Amino acid sequence: SAIEGQLKKGGRLFYAGCGTGGRLATLDTIEVQNTYGIDGSQIQAIFPGGIGCLTQTRESREDDLENGWHQLCDKHISKHDFVLGFSASGTTPFVLAILKHCKEAGIPTGCIVNNPHAPIAQAADYPVEVITGPEFVTGSTRMKAGSSQKMILDMISTSLQIRQGRVEGNKMVNAKLINHKLIDRACRIFMERNPEYTDYEKVKLLILKAGSVKKAEKLLKNKSDLDV
């Protein structure tokens, strides 16, 4: 609800994390754009050293106390935005520093951590603590901690898009039509929701003209004489 409130004000959601958590968060920002047809600026990720470091093992960057805040300032962060931090240990300097800067600037924050009573949880306005316990390989938080963060992240971003009206029923009616698979899925969703339209090729032309299932339905509603 807190994130939704910020987005309604025209704000953005920023994910901030290092290692596994940061990479999973960045993946989510990419996936939600296509699945829900949103602009890439609505949900963004902040990663140590910048997004260009995602595929490189420069984990020392997570000790930088100012890099994350500087990245946010470059994006003109404001009180209308929301920052969600990720840290398995709950102590990552990069994330903790960002949350502290946000608090000073009056920017609301949340976090997902995997240890109880962690400094990052104490610094966030809306902490989520998922206590996963020791990893099978000690310290390798890409396992249980990373998996739990991915599930919580999915819950947050999915419920947020549902509440914004980007999903109807359980269908991606706003998905971007960027390949044959998604175009075909959009056609099948449209025909399932509108069984009176049975000509697949004509539906496909309509979908491509409109840009999404939802826009196609709106187009039909406004122009009932369309040949479909």
Language-model segments: residues:
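Glycine-rich phosphate-binding loops that contact phosphosugars or nucleotide phosphates
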Residues: 13-151, 157-164
